[in-house]
């Protein structure tokens, strides 16, 4: 960011109008910058978009970071910081290590931990909405199909034009940062409903009994463990064919969905109820038919070709009607069985993305992000913007969380446990069982 401030003008950019956006660990890095001491003194950016931020439960302190650095330097066979600074970048990348923000008493501002205590009064039990049932996020029931489809090579589909932004009803033209303190930058924040599919392979190794044992070990409290097990309908007797889906839901909420809501609530409180725009991304990915982690990036960058199934034409639909049926009762049923379906049974579990719904989500997402980068409010900040499913877009009442995210389960199971313990639950379950343990 310092480089941008020093050099972006030479490329036609404006160092006084920088917008950050990041997904996953990149989103978490943005939050760390927002909570940094330097951001209070000299902000290096002016607004940010945080998409499905993924945190580690505990940031390293100086001692643990020092031990980690010693191991890295030892593997590189360097003994001083001066020699370490001269190591080629390729060698550092080859180590595969990542070391992010450190709680050293310098980087973060005073009281930054309060962002992760979630002491906000929740608004989910508003009058008139007690009857709404909590639903499961779109797509987690179709994880078997998720494994079977690989992404094609990156590249723009020739059959699609560039993303010409459609003329959408624009929100009020108030500058998104005009009424805020400089270090309280305007913020767009949200998540995908099936972010936990990012860890689906290690999660698939869990058994029901192993999950129960691990939760008891993490929570160190029978009552708190029982709250989680009851909320997510997990027990030692959960059938093998169901345990993966339920752990995916728990990990999704613990690692991404609930932390996203905590951050949104705290940021809005700090900004006096203004300058924070919440969204939910429930649109199916164009290839896997599920709103998986980074599905929003595929629409935002528009650089993954659509599958052929997205370009079905009206004439193809008409071909299903060939006139009146004329089938003899004596004809063998097996003669028509091979023509009844062109797809595997698993494909019925996912939603195909057609060209229209893809373009609608893509254009709306790009338009809102660009409007925000230009200093406009992307939508009303007292509303939630929805992307999907099936091409749905628009502002919605915040009561939609009762149907699109498991907010009441968070209140029951997560809030008594606390942010760090919930993060630890999510991290440990997302890594799968240890080799030879928790598998029986």
Locate each region found by the language model.
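Gly/Ser-rich "nucleophile elbow"/oxyanion-hole loop immediately N-terminal to the catalytic nucleophile
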Residues: 5-21
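Substrate-access "cap/lid" subdomains that shape
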Residues: 6, 42, 47, 51-211, ...
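Loop/turn elements at helix/coil->beta-strand transitions in domains of secreted/extracellular proteins
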Residues: 14-18, 42-47, 183-186, 270-276
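Short beta-strand immediately N-terminal to the catalytic nucleophile in serine-hydrolase-like folds
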Residues: 20-23, 51
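Short glycine-enriched nucleophile-adjacent loop
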Residues: 27-40
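C-terminal, loop-rich substrate-recognition/catalytic regions characterized by aromatic stacking residues
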Residues: 182-226, 366, 429-440
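Alpha/beta-hydrolase fold catalytic core
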Residues: 222-271, 277-278, 282
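Mobile gating loops/cap/lid regions near enzyme active sites that modulate substrate access
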Residues: 258-261, 265-440
